[in-house]
From Swiss-Prot:
UniProt keyword terms in alphabetical order: Arabinose catabolism, Carbohydrate metabolism, Isomerase, Manganese, Metal-binding
Source organism per UniProt: Bifidobacterium adolescentis (strain ATCC 15703 / DSM 20083 / NCTC 11814 / E194a)
BP GO terms, sorted: L-arabinose catabolic process to xylulose 5-phosphate
Catalytic activity: beta-L-arabinopyranose = L-ribulose
EC number: 5.3.1.4
Binding locations of Mn(2+): 308, 335, 352, 452
Enzyme category, top tier: isomerase
Pathway: Carbohydrate degradation; L-arabinose degradation via L-ribulose; D-xylulose 5-phosphate from L-arabinose (bacterial route): step 1/3
One of the Pfam families matching this protein, by short name: AraA_central
Entries under SUPFAM superfamilies matching the protein: FucI/AraA C-terminal domain-like, FucI/AraA N-terminal and middle domains
Name recorded for this polypeptide: L-arabinose isomerase
């Protein structure tokens, strides 16, 4: 089993701006040199989607046709623009106003160094990106169109890295726009932060969030073929340290867990869904609260999953899985559980009953085991038990703030647990939040962040910032420079801005 490549067949179109004023020879050089730049960027291996150079943009009609075609093509996930020469910005207005794909403005040039001894006006006319980029930048800012700006010579490794990160955010946005979320049951009773406006979420993020009866899952469970279950069990044996009793005296419970995974996967595929969520309060006649299956949603299928009806976190996990495709690490549901308040040795420990995914990386081979679980009122569930591997990571939550959604992110460092945790029968991760535990927790609570988060170890802050900019959604960030008093003031300004400037 492997996640489908979200970049397969996807393209980023590159539009270079100029004008007929410069003549055929100059325009020929514009196209040739831009082609060299695009070829170089594609060859770096840092940009997961193919960049495709389109004919030079020289007129308002040409720009509008380019933007219209890019917006209508489902394989195009983003547009890069660059002005090799001066390109009058009025000719960009009609095109920019019809663009619906993410935009990146590349401020670069073909030559790396000014040719001090040979530079003349012919060279200046051809190579005036510093001139053209400012003209283009003005009109984009005037129109209020969000875009990522990358500055530097195209051979600078940082340029390709930033373009690549943005391309990942574009893929996350494309996945969000085409996402179907399968809810088995409703929200956990009386819980506030996991609630949210599903209609507004579809308008803002594109994700279609709907409910299927748990009885539908039970019916799918009854239809699963034994051969599919046995194939899953063989996969478990190949990837995990399976507790001996699951292959002997408690094999029936292992079979049930695998059968539940198969049923969930079959329903997801039949309905074209890429994120799912269940609720331990609504299990119908399912034998177990699903454990190992949901844990494998991100790691084996690239799907989002969350618990207790929290579809918002499931959406984030799917987006995180797509953005991080092909990189080390992954995305998972995480929940803050317990603090270590020892001075100088302060940590946050996250976990969940069953659903934390090994996609984030594990210290040792995950153990597939069975333990009692009082919640849910079903038979003992089978689950993966492990500790998250040390890594840089971020935790991201989504909250419904009545008139808008807010994303909240904290940069963290996952560390090894300082003990065996031998009596803790669930997957977990221990981390140091930035800038420190007390400040991070205070700021998180001030911003109304959820106890459920999406933890990503594959992509970090920049990818989520790019995604939030594309979506036009508020993102509050807690990092090493955060000061609680200043954070509260910035949050007030952010609330005011996003209420007044809701471009949706």
């Amino acid at each position: 089993m492997a996640m489908e490549n979200p970049f397969e067949g996807k393209e980023i179109w590159f539009g270079v701006g100029s004008q007929d004023l410069y003549g055929e020879e100059a325009l020929r050089q514009v196209a040739q040199q831009t082609g060299e730049m695009v070829d170089f960027l594609n060859a770096t291996g840092k940009i997961p989607a193919k960049i495709v150079l389109k004919p030079t943009l020289k007129s308002s009609d040409g720009v509008k046709a380019f933007m219209t075609e890019a917006s209508a093509n489902p394989n195009v996930i983003g547009v890069i623009t660059w002005c090799h020469t001066f390109s009058p910005a009025k000719m960009w207005i009609r095109g920019l106003e019809v663009l619906t794909k993410p935009l990146l403005q590349l401020a670069t040039q073909h030559h790396k160094e000014i040719p001090w001894e040979t530079i003349d006006m012919d060279f200046m006319n051809l190579n005036q990106a510093a001139h053209g980029d400012r003209e283009f930048g003005y009109i984009v800012s005037r129109l209020g169109i969000p875009r990522k700006i990358v500055v530097g010579h195209y051979t600078d490794p940082e340029v390709a890295e930033k373009v690549g990160t943005w391309a990942r955010a574009c893929a996350g946005w494309d996945a969000s726009q085409n996402m179907k979320v399968m809810r088995w049951g409703d929200n956990m009773r009386n819980v506030a932060v996991t609630e949210g406006d599903k209609t507004e979420a579809e308008r803002v993020f594109g994700a279609s969030i709907n409910t299927w009866a748990v009885n539908d899952l039970v019916a799918a469970y009854e239809k699963v073929k034994d051969s599919q279950v046995k194939d899953l069990i063989e996969d478990y044996k190949a990837k995990y340290d399976v507790a001996p009793e699951l292959l002997d005296s408690r094999y029936d419970e292992l079979f049930i867990a695998a059968k539940e995974e198969a049923a969930m996967v079959n329903m997801m595929r039949e309905n074209g869904c890429t994120a799912g969520v269940d609720n331990f309060e609504d299990l119908g006649t399912l034998p177990q609260l699903p454990g190992v299956g949901p844990q494998r949603f991100p790691s084996e299928y690239g799907w989002g999953f969350s618990a207790e009806g929290d579809w918002k976190t499931s959406v984030l996990v799917r987006i995180g899985a797509v953005m991080g495709y092909g990189l080390e690490g992954g995305a998972s549901l995480m929940e803050d559980y317990s603090y270590n308040f020892v001075p100088g040795n302060e940590f946050d420990m996250g976990s969940h009953m069953l659903e934390v995914s090994p996609s984030i990386g594990t210290i040792a081979k995950p153990k597939l085991a069975i333990y009692p679980l009082g919640i849910g009122g079903k038979s003992d569930p089978v689950r993966l038990v492990f500790s998250g591997k040390p890594a840089d990571a971020v935790v991201v939550s989504m909250a419904d703030e009545r008139e808008r959604f807010r994303l909240l992110m904290d940069e963290v460092t996952i560390v090894e647990p300082q003990g065996s945790l031998k009596n803790l029968p669930c997957a977990r991760a221990v981390w140091k939040p930035k800038p420190d535990l007390k400040t991070a927790v205070q700021c998180w609570i001030t911003a109304g962040g959820s106890h459920h988060t999406c933890m990503t170890t594959s992509v970090g802050r920049e990818a989520w910032e790019d995604f939030a900019r594309i979506a036009g959604v508020e993102l509050a960030v807690i990092d090493e420079n955060t000061n609680a008093r200043q954070f509260e003031k910035e949050l007030e300004l952010s609330e005011m801005y996003h209420r007044l400037n809701n471009r949706h």
